[in-house]
């Protein structure tokens, strides 16, 4: 038995078994209490984009994080009831465009009910390997192929292997904390 198989067996043995779907379990914490607490967890602001057979689509997200650097993989969480969900599932590619401090209004466009064409018309885009839209002046863009999707509650967690990236050294970052945007100033090396 390999170390990975042994570890998985140990994890499976220690996790409680249940036939009840996660969404039907009684919550130990109230939904609003949880949301209020999560608002205190600051994060980068991202516009997630895709293009392909399912169409061109994009949405604003803060539920993005690194998974591993070998292979370079990140995750993106997407509500299955979101209007853009079918496009992302069908295309199986996406780009995580991490926003600069000048992108607050663009974040609001992609986070609302603005028609998709108007969202994309508000900025300049290019593409790299997958054909997903790359925001030309993003702080960083991670061009990805979706390698795995896991359902948890109301959301799909998309695990995405980074196949290309692009960094911009000429801007500062944008964070979302306590339901407000905050600029993040980069340290300039001498």
From Swiss-Prot:
Alphabetical UniProt keywords: Flavoprotein, FMN, NAD, Oxidoreductase
Catalytic function, reaction form: FMNH2 + NAD(+) = FMN + NADH + 2 H(+)
Catalytic class of the enzyme: oxidoreductase
Domain of life of the native organism: Bacteria
Presence of the UniProt keyword Ribonucleoprotein in the record: no
A single GO BP: nitrogen utilization
NCBIfam families reported in the protein's UniProt record: RutF
Role this protein plays: Catalyzes the reduction of FMN to FMNH2 which is used to reduce pyrimidine by RutA via the Rut pathway.
Protein name as it appears in the record: FMN reductase (NADH) RutF
Taxonomic lineage of the native organism: Bacteria, Pseudomonadati, Pseudomonadota, Gammaproteobacteria, Enterobacterales
Gene assigned in the entry: rutF
């Amino acid at each position: 038995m390999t170390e990975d198989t042994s570890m998985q067996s140990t994890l499976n043995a220690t996790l409680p078994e249940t036939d009840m779907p996660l969404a039907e379990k009684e919550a130990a914490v109230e939904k609003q209490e949880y949301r209020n607490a999560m608002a205190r967890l600051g994060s980068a602001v991202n516009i997630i984009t895709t293009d392909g057979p399912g169409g061109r689509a994009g949405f604003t997200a803060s539920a993005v994080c690194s998974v591993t650097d070998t292979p370079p993989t990140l995750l993106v969480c997407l509500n299955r009831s979101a209007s853009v969900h079918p496009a992302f599932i069908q295309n199986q590619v996406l780009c995580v465009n991490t926003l600069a401090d000048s992108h607050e209004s663009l974040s609001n466009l992609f986070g609302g009910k603005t028609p998709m064409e108007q969202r994309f018309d508000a900025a300049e885009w290019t593409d790299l390997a997958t054909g997903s839209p790359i925001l030309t002046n993003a702080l960083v863009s991670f061009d990805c192929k979706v390698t795995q999707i896991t359902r948890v509650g109301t959301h799909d967690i998309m695990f995405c292997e980074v196949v290309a990236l692009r960094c911009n050294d000429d801007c500062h970052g944008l964070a979302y904390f306590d339901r407000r945007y905050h600029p993040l100033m980069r340290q300039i090396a001498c």
